């Protein structure tokens, strides 16, 4: 069986290709170039990543293909990213990149190369099972809970999962590095990439200012509406943000120890261009026990059961929280949590699970 592996130059995708080759698959590596604006930028690692991929493919003994999806990325991912920030929301472009680029453009290209499956270095698992006499594919959490990436894959569908392999889903990160080291892959100790793929390690505000001009407005206290300062643009702030407000010297509420409590972003009024803040991490305005989600994707192709207790992540790297789902139709649902959740953020994704199975999710309104 021919498998095309999406390779980034990191240890995860490198070991993915290695394991599949060892298992007898006909493997081809494919390097995707998804961003061109910063080819000569100090933060851009694309050239070195391609060098690393070529070296790994040479050691493993597989062919390498290079494809440029920059135009598709700008149209399907980056344009949405800018629209969301302009609207005062906080999007997660990595989720859209997965569904639109890595598991659509890449998948289509791999099929044109004659592949029967694609594979990536994501920490997740795919399971095929028979439901009412029909074959169905489930997305499961990875064995390594600290690296699980199912949250970022919730927008995948049955057709995409049916063609996808996740060889690292049953492994721990330390095992992956050991496998790479034993095989003589120089990327065994390479640092994991962080941040949004097209931003890399650069300061986020600096990057965003290149595409969205500053739009100063007032910072107001949500409790008494007094003006506390000025912001340079609502897009530079997110719900629950504490740092970078430049109002720390303004006193107000005190905690039990007599210390003045920190200010947190609680609300954005896009029409008035006002940023509202509150004092104290546990201020009631930062705690909500329900949310409205839209643009829903249920991996099985059907709504989950109503009045059934599931769990959900309202952001990445948070614990799964018990909840109930009320499907409202037209791609919307209300999710009610058993306990109040902190800083629910419009634009972020809420992802629903039943035990280890990722059911899907949507975007917080």
UniProtKB/Swiss-Prot annotation:
Region described as Interaction with target base in tRNA: 92-94
Region Interaction with tRNA, as annotated, extends over 147-149, 315-316
Record bears the keyword Ion transport: no
Q: Which domain of life is it from?
A: Bacteria
- Is Protein transport one of the keywords UniProt gives this record? no
Disulfide partners: 97-197
Keyword terms = ATP-binding, Cytoplasm, Disulfide bond, Nucleotide-binding, RNA-binding, Transferase, tRNA processing, tRNA-binding
Q: Which InterPro entries match?
A: MnmA-like (IPR004506), MnmA-like_C (IPR046885), MnmA-like_central (IPR046884), MnmA-like_central_sf (IPR023382), Rossmann-like_a/b/a_fold (IPR014729)
Q: Which GO terms describe its biological process?
A: tRNA wobble position uridine thiolation
> Where does the record place the catalytic residues?
97, 197
The UniProt entry, under PANTHER family, shows: MITOCHONDRIAL TRNA-SPECIFIC 2-THIOURIDYLASE 1, TRNA 5-METHYLAMINOMETHYL-2-THIOURIDYLATE -METHYLTRANSFERASE
* Protein family membership: Belongs to the MnmA/TRMU family.
Q: What does this protein do?
A: Catalyzes the 2-thiolation of uridine at the wobble position (U34) of tRNA, leading to the formation of s(2)U34.
What HAMAP family does UniProt report for this protein, alphabetically?
A: tRNA_thiouridyl_MnmA
Q: What is this protein called?
A: tRNA-specific 2-thiouridylase MnmA
Q: Which organism is it from?
A: Azoarcus sp. (strain BH72)
């Amino acid at each position: 069986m021919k498998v095309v592996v999406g390779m980034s130059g990191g240890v995860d995708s490198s070991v993915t290709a290695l394991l599949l080759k060892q298992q007898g698959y006909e493997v081809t590596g494919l390097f995707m170039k998804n961003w061109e604006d910063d080819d000569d930028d100090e933060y851009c690692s694309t050239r070195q990543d391609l060098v690393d991929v070529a070296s790994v493919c040479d050691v493993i003994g597989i062919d390498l293909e290079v494809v440029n999806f920059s135009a598709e990325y700008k149209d399907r991912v980056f344009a949405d990213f800018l629209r969301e920030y302009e609207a005062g929301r906080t999007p997660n472009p990595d989720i859209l990149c997965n569904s639109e680029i890595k598991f659509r453009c890449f998948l289509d290209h791999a099929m044109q190369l004659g592949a029967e499956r694609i594979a990536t270095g994501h920490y997740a698992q795919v399971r095929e099972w028979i439901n009412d006499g029909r074959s169905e594919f489930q997305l499961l959490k990875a064995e390594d809970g600290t690296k699980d990436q199912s949250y970022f894959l919730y927008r995948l569908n049955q057709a995409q999962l049916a063609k996808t392999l996740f060889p690292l889903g049953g492994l721990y990160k330390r095992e992956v590095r050991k496998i790479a080291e034993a095989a003589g892959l120089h990327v065994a100790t390479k640092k994991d990439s962080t941040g949004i793929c097209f931003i890399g390690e650069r300061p986020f505000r600096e990057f965003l200012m290149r595409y969205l001009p500053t739009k100063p407005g007032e910072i107001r206290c949500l409790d008494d509406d007094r003006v506390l300062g000025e912001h340079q643009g609502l897009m530079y702030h997110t719900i629950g943000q504490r740092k970078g407000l430049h109002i720390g010297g303004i006193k107000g509420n005190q905690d039990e120890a007599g210390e003045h409590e920190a200010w947190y972003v609680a609300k954005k009024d896009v029409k008035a261009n006002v940023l509202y803040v509150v004092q104290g991490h546990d201020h009631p305005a930062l705690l909500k026990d329900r949310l409205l989600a839209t643009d829903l994707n249920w991996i099985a192709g059907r709504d989950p059961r109503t009045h059934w207790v599931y769990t959900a992540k309202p952001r990445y790297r948070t614990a799964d929280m018990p909840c109930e789902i009320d499907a409202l139709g037209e791609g919307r649902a209300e999710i009610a949590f058993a306990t109040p959740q902190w800083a629910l953020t419009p634009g972020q994704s809420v992802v629903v699970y039943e035990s280890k199975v990722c059911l899907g999710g949507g975007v917080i309104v």
